Amino acid sequence: MGEVEISARAYGKMCLHASRYPHAAVNGLLLAPATGSGECLCLTDCVPLFHSHLALSVMLEVALNQVDVWGAQAGLVVAGYYHANAVLDDQSPGPLALKIAGRIAEFFPRAVLIMLDNKKLVTRPRVPPVIVLENQGLQWVPKDKNLVMWRDWEESRQMVGALLEGRAHQHLVDFDCHLDDIRQDWTNQRLNTQITQWSGSTDGNA
C-alpha cells in the first residue's frame, strides 16, 4: 500500500481529544478528500467520536451516518479510524478498534488504523506519538514508517504544544458532548479556525 500523509489538523485534533480525556479511551474518524488520487492517502481532518460510549453500536451508527453526510458535503470520505486506550502503556488495538476499522475498510480498502501512543503524548514530543496500521488481508499490521508522511512535523508538534498550553483541548467537542447537548459543534469549526490561524501566523513569520 502507498504513502499516508497526516495533516496538522488531523494530528492536532487527535491529540487534543486524548488530552481532554486523559484517563479514558477515546476514538474518532479520519477523513480524506473524496477525489484523492495517486498512491498517497492524505488525512486532512478527523472527527472525534467518543470518550464514554465507545462500545454502544447505536450511537456509533448515528455518528457514522452524520459524518458520512457532512463529509460528502465537504468533499471528504471516512478513510480511517483512530483510537487511544485508557491504559497508559497499551498501544495495541483491541476488539472494538479492530471492528470499527474493519468496517471502514470494507467501504474504503485503503483505510488506516491509528493508535495513539499515550506514553509519547506530551506537549511537544520529539517523535510522532502515533502507530499507523494498514489492513493486509484479515490483519492490521504496522505500516512502514518510511511511508508515513507529515506535511510539516515540526509545525504540527509546535502547534499542538501551543494549543495545549492555551488549553484549547478544553473546547474540543466529540460526539459524546454533542449527544449530551446538540448545540455543541462536533465538526469543531472553532478549533479548526484556531489551527488555521496558528499555521498562518507561522507561515507569516517564516
From Swiss-Prot:
Concerning InterPro entries, the annotation shows: EMC8/9, MPN
One GO term describing the cellular component: EMC complex
Q: Which GO terms describe its molecular function?
A: membrane insertase activity
The membrane-topology field of this record reads: Peripheral membrane protein
Q: Which Pfam families match?
A: UPF0172 (PF03665)
Keyword annotations for this protein? Endoplasmic reticulum, Membrane
- Where does this protein reside within or beyond the cell? Endoplasmic reticulum membrane
Q: Which domain of life is it from?
A: Eukaryota
Signal peptide (residue range): none
GO process annotations (BP): protein insertion into ER membrane by stop-transfer membrane-anchor sequence; tail-anchored membrane protein insertion into ER membrane
Q: Return the similarity comment.
A: Belongs to the EMC8/EMC9 family.
- PANTHER family the UniProt entry points to: ER MEMBRANE PROTEIN COMPLEX (PTHR12941), ER MEMBRANE PROTEIN COMPLEX SUBUNIT 9 (PTHR12941:SF12)
What is its quaternary makeup? Component of the ER membrane protein complex (EMC). EMC8 and EMC9 are mutually exclusive subunits of the EMC complex.
The identity of this protein, by name, is ER membrane protein complex subunit 9
